[in-house]
């Protein structure tokens, strides 16, 4: 896959992650009582360390690429450095200082590739860029949902025409609209709105696109 393919898929997957949360919302109870949310799990992530979570608005800006994601990751505060079997608490430290050997908690210690891999594992945006795209929006559900989610993603992202249609659908949404949808979905799910449309209507369009993508790949 190409560089442009990564950017296109990252943008579409980020924009649609709240919709996926709404479709697969499945955590309305806490300790056997209604908690006021369709997806409590999604609400919890809304209130988790903003330095390492969220909708990555920079991904929609001109110049987005692997380097920009690396810059973002470098700016995320560290949790730990592992040496042997020991985890050294360096919470809040700057990874760039570790690259320079100037980490106050471990002076002279320099970053390794393992340190970088460990650091990347502590970043939890709605979609995490790895050697693949890790989409984090859906709650766990029954078996039918477990198989429906990869079918939806395959239909959207593995067929070029479907991906282009999905990109056209989400392109008019602004960063503020995407963020407002992300905030609304945990409680409202498909009753939320974006771009003057209710999310349920948008979901129908997305499912139609995904079905077309699956059909073109010989899947039904």
What residue ranges belong to the model's regions?
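C-terminal accessory/tail domains of diverse enzymes
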Residues: 3-220
């Amino acid at each position: 896959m190409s560089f442009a393919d990564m950017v296109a898929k990252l943008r579409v997957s980020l924009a649609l992650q709240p919709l996926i949360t709404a479709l697969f919302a499945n955590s309305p109870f806490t300790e056997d009582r209604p908690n006021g949310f369709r997806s409590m799990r999604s609400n919890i992530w809304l209130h988790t360390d903003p330095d390492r979570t969220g909708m990555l608005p920079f991904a929609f800006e001109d110049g987005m690429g692997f380097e920009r994601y690396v810059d973002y990751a470098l700016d995320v505060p560290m949790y730990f450095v592992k040496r042997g079997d020991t985890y050294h608490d360096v919470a809040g430290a700057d990874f760039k200082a570790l690259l320079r050997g100037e980490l106050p908690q471990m002076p002279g210690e320099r970053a390794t590739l393992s340190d970088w891999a460990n650091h990347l594992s502590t970043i939890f945006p709605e979609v995490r860029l790895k050697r693949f795209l890790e989409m984090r929006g859906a709650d766990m559900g029954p078996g039918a949902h477990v198989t429906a989610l990869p079918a939806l993603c395959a239909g959207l992202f593995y067929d070029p025409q479907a991906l282009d249609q999905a990109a056209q659908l989400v392109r008019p949404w602004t960063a503020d609209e995407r963020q407002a949808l992300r905030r609304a979905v945990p409680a409202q799910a498909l009753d939320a709105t974006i771009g003057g449309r209710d999310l349920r209507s948008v979901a129908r369009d997305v499912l139609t696109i995904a079905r077309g993508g699956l059909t073109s790949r010989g899947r039904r």
